[in-house]
C-alpha cells in the first residue's frame, strides 16, 4: 500500500504532462493542416469562389474562438452541400470540373478540421451579411495563422 501512495503523485504528474503535450501537438498538426488547405483553396480560382456565403466575421465581437470555428464550419458545410452539383460551378471543361471537385474536397476537409477545433455540436449562423467565398477563406486563413503563431509560441 505504501508503494502505491508514493507512486500516485508522479503518475498524476506524468499523466498531466502527457495530456498537455498531446493537446499542444494536436493543435499544431490540425492548424498546420487547416492553413495548408486554406493556402490551396485561396490559390485556386474557380467559378464558385466568387459566389457568396454568410459573413460570420462581420459581427464577431462577442463570439468565442470555438463559436467562430463552429460557425465557419457551418458556413462551409452549407456552401459545399448546396453547390457540390451546381452546374454553374462545374464548368464547361474537364479542367473546370476537376478544379470544382478539388474545391469541394478541400472544403470538406476544412469543415472536418474546424469542427474538431470547435468541439461544439451545432451553432447558429445568422445570414445578415454576405461575402464571397474567396474573401471568407482569406479572412479565415488570417485568423488561423494568428492562432498558429499563438499556439506554437
Swiss-Prot record:
Cystine pairings recorded for this chain: 27-151, 48-89, 70-123
Glycan-modified residues: 62
One of the GO BP terms on file: cholesterol metabolic process
InterPro entries per UniProt: 4_helix_cytokine-like_core, IL-4, IL-4/IL-13, IL-4/IL-13_CS
GO cellular component: extracellular region; extracellular space
Functional description taken from the UniProt entry: Cytokine secreted primarily by mast cells, T-cells, eosinophils, and basophils that plays a role in regulating antibody production, hematopoiesis and inflammation, and the development of effector T-cell responses. Induces the expression of class II MHC molecules on resting B-cells. Enhances both secretion and cell surface expression of IgE and IgG1. Also regulates the expression of the low affinity Fc receptor for IgE (CD23) on both lymphocytes and monocytes. Positively regulates IL31RA expression in macrophages.
Disease: Ischemic stroke: A stroke is an acute neurologic event leading to death of neural tissue of the brain and resulting in loss of motor, sensory and/or cognitive function. Ischemic strokes, resulting from vascular occlusion, is considered to be a highly complex disease consisting of a group of heterogeneous disorders with multiple genetic and environmental risk factors.
Family: Belongs to the IL-4/IL-13 family.
Protein name per Swiss-Prot or TrEMBL: Interleukin-4
Provenance organism: Homo sapiens
Lineage, highest ranks first: Eukaryota, Metazoa, Chordata, Craniata, Vertebrata
Amino acid at each position: 500500500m505504501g508503494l502505491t501512495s508514493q507512486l500516485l503523485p508522479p503518475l498524476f504528474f506524468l499523466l498531466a504532462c502527457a495530456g498537455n503535450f498531446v493537446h499542444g501537438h494536436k493543435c499544431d498538426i490540425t492548424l498546420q493542416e487547416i492553413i495548408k488547405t486554406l493556402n490551396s483553396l485561396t490559390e485556386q480560382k474557380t467559378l464558385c469562389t466568387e459566389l457568396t456565403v454568410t459573413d460570420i466575421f462581420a459581427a464577431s465581437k462577442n463570439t468565442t474562438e470555438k463559436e467562430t470555428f463552429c460557425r465557419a464550419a457551418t458556413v462551409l458545410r452549407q456552401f459545399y452541400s448546396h453547390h457540390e452539383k451546381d452546374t454553374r460551378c462545374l464548368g464547361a471543361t474537364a479542367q473546370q470540373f476537376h478544379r470544382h471537385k478539388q474545391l469541394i474536397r478541400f472544403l470538406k476537409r476544412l469543415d472536418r478540421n474546424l469542427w474538431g477545433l470547435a468541439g461544439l455540436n451545432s451553432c447558429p449562423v445568422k445570414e445578415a451579411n454576405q461575402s464571397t467565398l474567396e474573401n471568407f477563406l482569406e479572412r479565415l486563413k488570417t485568423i488561423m495563422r494568428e492562432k498558429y503563431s499563438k499556439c506554437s509560441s
